[in-house]
Amino acid sequence: EIQKLKKEKMLCWLYDEDRWPSGSAGGIVTKNVQYRSRFLVFEPEGVDKEEKEEFMSAAKAVRSKNRFLLGSYRIILNEEGRLKSYQSLKTEKPNEAGEIWSAWLEVSGDTPWFNNQAYVNTLDKNAINQFIEITHQEYYKRFADEFGKTIPGIFTDEPQTCHKEVLSEPFEKKAVILPFTDDFDDTFQKRYGFSILECIPELIWERENGEISQARY
């Protein structure tokens, strides 16, 4: 109790979550699918969907069927596994060389770690505002008089995006997960003048000529 702490001349640091990492308010925020974590899935044509982890104490991507296509690409690698060429496909051209990879925006599925909900979309200001309203503002409603006194602050525990993945070797055929959100490409274009979706293969493979991809930085 606050009064007991005051009597003992102790401070009360508040915690804003029921477990690590902060953001979902114990799954309350992410009952609204709009506020769930999103991620980009980049995968080769015909790849089998990976097994879902039974238990996961992290904000790693949780695969689901809730996704939509962002784009498809024809990829050609050289003998060393470097990116020789690629093109964004608007229409399928089955007789051309190369392998087809596709990028999907996927919404996080349920996981027991977040009370059978999902982690929050930390790239969405509205989602985080909802988290603050449910947690920090609720604390303030109850203990406003003690903020800045007995209560010096609120501890937020490592909010994060989904974990970024890479291929273990350039010819590996598996899905690669990257942090992403609904307006990521629009925001990127406004800031840098080109679409990140046009350059997704450069985030996965090294260029054949050894040049550094501007899109990575």
Labelled PLM ranges:
Residues 1-217:
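Mature extracytoplasmic enzyme cores
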